[in-house]
Amino acid sequence: MILCAGESLIDMVPSDGTFRPLAGGAVYNTAIALGRLGQDTGYLWPISRDPFGDQILRPLAEAGVNTDLCPRTDRLTTLALVTLTNGEARYSFYDEGSAGRMLLPEDIGPLPDTVTALFAGGISLVPDPCGGTIEALIAQHHDRLPVMIDPNIRPFFITDAGAYRARLARLMPMADIVKLSADDLEWLHPDLSPEDAARAVLATGPKLVLQTGGEAGAKAIWAGETVHAPAVRATVADTIGAGDTFNAGVLASLDRQGLLSKDAIAAITADQIHAALTLGAQAAAVTVSRHGANPPWAHEMPA
């Protein structure tokens, strides 16, 4: 089971002059996408008992995602106000004292033996206590489980850039795979080109650094020659959840190829990487073709 640990929230998405509440969150979207693609998936994050919490749980159940590690709480659900400019999403978060933000280490029980990989990232890595809790989870299990991290950096959400950079500096060496957008790479290394920035991240310890660039497609920076997979053409409705779905496609491909182990990732080949990037791009193309974070089901994917 691929365990996705990180935020779920309600995206307040513009709709006919008002806002429509949609369940979302970077790591949550990846969990939903993995479940819809047919992968054995678990989710770890506190879920509020408010009506929005019930709205968050329904798509997880529909996608077959295991939520046994999701504690219920009376704290309120995080809200993200979404604004769209030419289909590009920007977010304002209402998160103080929310259900997810207050995740503590004691809220997480022992991981079941069925967990075979760990995915984490998003805004859940920024504030405490939840950021420290996710960091501790990764620190506890990274020696045994392959770890993929997508920080999905939101500069406007970061109140202490130094502390956040320090957390990422601790997390990236524990990860086997790190996914970063061009914006993420610029924030991390503003004086470097995107590829040099990706190689700087690779030098900290991951075996793969995946760089996404929208229409430019995706690249994998690793010990071998750079692997590139072109973007899949799509009529873009909006980009909400595109990167999250890409992550799910990559993980699903690695799982199907029998590569979701630390040893297998360390010995991965260019062809295997290309297959993973391609499935990620194909899945993301479906998501951007429709409004909101609505990743594809397995039957909607190319044969």
Annotated model-derived regions:
Residues M1-N66:
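Glycine-rich phosphate/adenosyl-contacting loop at the front of the ribokinase-like
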Residues S8, A26, I123, P151, ...:
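Active-site metal-binding loops of divalent metal-dependent hydrolases
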Residues I10, P14, R49, I153-P155, ...:
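Short, glycine/acidic-enriched loop or turn micro-motifs at the edges of active sites
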Residues L34, S181, G243:
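Short, conserved phosphate/pyrophosphate- and ester-handling motifs at nucleotide-, phospho-/glycolipid
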Residues D40-I123, V147, A303:
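Conserved N-terminal subdomain of the carbohydrate kinase-like
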Residues A117, I123-R199, P206, A216-G217:
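Conserved beta-alpha-beta core of the PfkB/ribokinase-like small-molecule kinase fold
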Residues P190-A303:
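Conserved phosphate-binding/catalytic region of the ribokinase-like
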